[in-house]
Amino acid sequence: ALLIGVGPGAACTTRGVLGIGVPQVTATVDAATARDFYHKRTGKYIPIITDGGMNRGGDICKAFACGADAVMIGSSFARAKEAPGRGYHWGMATSHVNLPRGTRIYVGATGSLKEILFGPAKVDDGSQNLMGALKTSMGSLGAANLKQMHDVEIIIAPSIQTEGKIFQVDQRVGMGK
């Protein structure tokens, strides 16, 4: 498997420290394109794991639509009441004396692991019921499985998070937070 993601995680500072990194959607699409080319030439399929920035259901859905076969989730699980960090998250690139490029961040405890994964959601920002978001997105796109998510059409809209959300932004609710 190929792990994709340099610096998009909530606790990671790699992009700032090293000055490298590619936005997560772009990195996943580029890796999936190369993987598919390699698969056609050799018959060998290399699964892609998108790692970093998977905070909301929409982030996970976009990763699969861009070609990921799996995602790694860190800060969302760190927010679970059962998490051993008690509201704190240490990224994969934890602090090191030779090249510090990660930090410990406070993410709080927003719900149980069950609520974060399966709901019911108690917040309106997409950070709970991650599986419900994935199932709804797949249904809306006509994808019966994750492999079919790789074939959906992707359109990049610069203001997709806030487009038409004037009241949410004004009242700081939902996607306006």
Residue locations for each model-derived region?
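Non-cysteine beta-strand/loop elements that form the S-adenosyl-L-methionine
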Residues: 1-8, 73-74
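Helix-rich catalytic cores of soluble enzyme domains
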Residues: 1-3, 14, 21
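Alpha/beta catalytic cores of nucleotide-metabolism and tRNA/nucleoside-modifying enzymes
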Residues: 19-50, 55-177
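Gly-rich Lys/Arg/Thr-decorated short loops/hinges at beta-loop-alpha junctions or inter-strand turns
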Residues: 6-16
